[in-house]
Curated annotation (Swiss-Prot):
Belongs to the acetyltransferase family. It comes from Mycobacterium tuberculosis (strain ATCC 25618 / H37Rv). GO terms for molecular function: acyltransferase activity, transferring groups other than amino-acyl groups. Its EC number is 2.3.1.-. It is an enzyme of class 2 (transferase). Residues 6-172 form the N-acetyltransferase domain. Keywords: Acyltransferase, Transferase. The keyword GTP-binding does not apply. The keyword Acyltransferase applies. This is Probable N-acetyltransferase Rv2775. InterPro entries: Acyl_CoA_acyltransferase, Bact_Acetyltransf, GNAT_dom. Gene3D superfamilies: 3.40.630.30.
Length: 174
């Protein structure tokens, strides 16, 4: 895959079905060993994302979705925007690259898109404590655990510990 054949652009609602078709398998793969497949079946689906999750996320002021595409097909996506509690920080809600397109710099290019969209804002995100692949990616990009913790409870009795990461572009506290 040649980097020159990859285009990064803002997604439009018409793109959502193709984005979800790419996003869903890599999302499931990212949760392998963290949540059982039957639980994933209960909490996410491409149809749900196209009809509800993507539109609701993007209704938040300042939020956007960007996609990486090759040959007119999405091979990566990211969603980000101002954090509700701290609008001076930009939260990355999602960054996924199709499995066969990983390790070609696409995730880094999508992350750079978010960084350039808000050049002076600190970037924050949540990462499942057990998601070592994602944690490694962000740590290589100079994100650091920032002391925040969160337990995601997608279903009754299902608890998924998360840690907060932050890329400091202002002076870190302390």
């Amino acid at each position: 895959m040649k980097p020159s054949n990859i285009r990064i652009r803002a997604a439009k609602p018409i793109d959502f079905p193709k984005v979800a078709a790419m996003h869903y398998p890599v999302w499931r793969q990212s949760w392998t060993g963290i949540l059982d497949p039957y639980l994933l079946d209960m909490i996410g689906s491409p149809k749900l994302w196209v009809e509800e999750s993507y539109p609701q996320s993007l209704k938040r002021g300042g939020w956007s979705m960007w996609i990486a595409e090759s040959g007119g097909q999405p091979i990566g996506m990211t969603m980000f925007g101002p954090d509700i509690a701290h609008p001076d920080r930009i939260q990355i809600d999602a960054l996924y690259v199709a499995e066969n397109s990983q390790r070609h710099g696409i995730g880094g290019r999508l992350l750079n898109r978010a960084l350039h969209s808000h050049p002076s804002a600190d970037m924050i995100l949540w990462c499942a404590e057990k998601n070592s692949k994602a944690r490694g990616f962000y740590e290589k990009k100079d994100f650091h655990i920032d002391g925040r913790t969160f337990t995601w409870k997608p279903l009754s009795g299902v608890n998924v510990p998360h840690v907060g990461y932050r890329l400091y572009r202002s002076a870190p506290p302390g």
